[in-house]
A protein has these predicted regions:
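Low-complexity intrinsically disordered segments
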Residues: 2-4, 70, 97
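N-terminal helix-turn-helix DNA-binding core of bacterial DNA-binding proteins
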Residues: 19-69, 90, 96
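Basic, amphipathic "hinge/linker" alpha-helix immediately C-terminal to the N-terminal HTH DNA-binding motif
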Residues: 89-113
Length: 136
């Protein structure tokens, strides 16, 4: 494994941290990949990459996501340092979510995936039909 420098926790700053091997079963990178490759995480991060948003605005924009799933995903992304949550003591309380600098580093890759999927969806559908037809 390659070593890098851990800089996300101030008390651990400068501590050598193994880069990881996503192909290894016990590598924590897999859990992170599961989270950032999740459809809800991708959509949330891309929206927050455009602008800060409140919970209900995210829920309205991401059709099909349940309140529970949105809440769980935001908590996970916040824990990973990809999203930040700001609470303002108003009546009612105002909670705003923003992407962090760490999360911003994902935007280009995530947008490329979305662009690829939207561009190649007809090809994928054609391949699926051909596969299904071949199976009978």
């Amino acid at each position: 494994m390659q070593e890098g420098t851990l800089t996300s926790d101030s008390h651990l700053e400068g501590t050598p941290f193994p880069r990881g091997d996503a192909y290894a079963a016990d590598c924590p990178t897999r859990k992170l990949l599961d989270r950032i490759a999740d459809k809800w995480s991708v959509l949330i991060l891309l929206l927050l990459g455009q602008e800060a948003m409140r919970f209900n605005a995210l829920k309205r924009r991401i059709e099909g996501v349940s309140q529970k799933m949105l809440s769980q995903t935001l908590r996970s992304l916040e824990r990973d340092g990809l999203v930040s949550r700001t609470v303002v003591a108003t009546v009612p309380v105002t909670v705003t979510y923003t992407i962090t600098p760490l999360g911003s580093g994902l935007i280009g890759s995530l947008q490329s995936m979305i662009d690829w999927a939207e561009t190649h969806m007809p090809d994928v559908v054609a391949a699926q039909r051909a596969h299904d037809d071949a199976l009978g």
